[in-house]
Amino acid sequence: MELERIVGSALLTFVQAHLPEADLSGLDEVIFSYVLGVLEDLGPSGPSEENFDMEAFTEMMEAYVPGFAHIPRGIIGDMMQKLSVQLSDARNKENLHPQSSCVQGQVPIFPETPRQAEKLEEESRPPAAPGNTLDEAAAAEELPGVDVLLEVFPTCSMEQAQWVLAKARGDLEEAVHMLVEGKEEGPPGWDGPSQDLPRRLRGPQKDDLKSFILQKYMMVDRAEDQKTHRPMAPKEAPKKLIRYIDNQVVSTKGERFKDVRNPEAEEMKATYINLKPARKYRFH
């Protein structure tokens, strides 16, 4: 979380310096994790032309921060190089442990005192790069309202104050209002200026992380939720019309009738006379 906070502060300062009118709402923990993963893959040597795909990185950042592709590639490379140095220093501080006087197979003669441990830590701490100090000074000059926020909210850190002020686009009153009312989630690991702030301002807990991600990034069809499902009543089947009765064609309107003929005897058939004249055949 400390590394992501460093990445977030550096990106906000960089974008605010080169794109003052840019929309910073797309900068969240997702893009911070992406940049941190890219720097971890590059290793301690930092980005170079051989191992760093500048076009892919610029395309990804352009999707989250419109206008990022217009920043010169050399400036982006310098920013990534400085950020890699800052992350290396932070990792060295995290991995730094007091060296024990106990050697394998030997018993320590006397334990180290706390002052000796502090002195050892100060001696093995790498000297701060001059570029980092200049970057911090430039960030403080670019965001003059940070000092005011730190005075109003003593528990708020420098990165948190820069984050909220950048989201408010330099408007100090809006930044204070966002902190007081709890309208800003803050950078990763944000604990809020006080314990009385809403929970969403302090960031999600480990148990609520899954529900927090789903709530923030899941597609919700709100129009469908507002609709009331009213299924249509089934239509009555139309009246089945009878067309045939006893193999006899009848009306298609549904009347049930048929042509009933009384059988005639052979004697009556013999009395019938065919009035049709016989066909005349002419032979040529």
Curated annotation (Swiss-Prot):
Residues 141-184 form the CUE domain. It comes from the Eukaryota. Its main location: cytoplasm. One of its GO terms (cellular component) is cytosol. It is found in: Cytoplasm; Nucleus. One of its GO terms (biological process) is negative regulation of cytokine production involved in inflammatory response. GO terms for molecular function: ubiquitin binding. Residues 183-204 are annotated as: Disordered. Keywords: Cytoplasm, Nucleus, Ubl conjugation pathway. InterPro entries: CUE, CUE_CUED2. The CUE domain mediates interaction with PGR and ESR1. Belongs to the CUEDC2 family. Controls PGR and ESR1 protein levels through their targeting for ubiquitination and subsequent proteasomal degradation. Interacts with PGR and ESR1. This is CUE domain-containing protein 2. It comes from Mus musculus (Mouse).
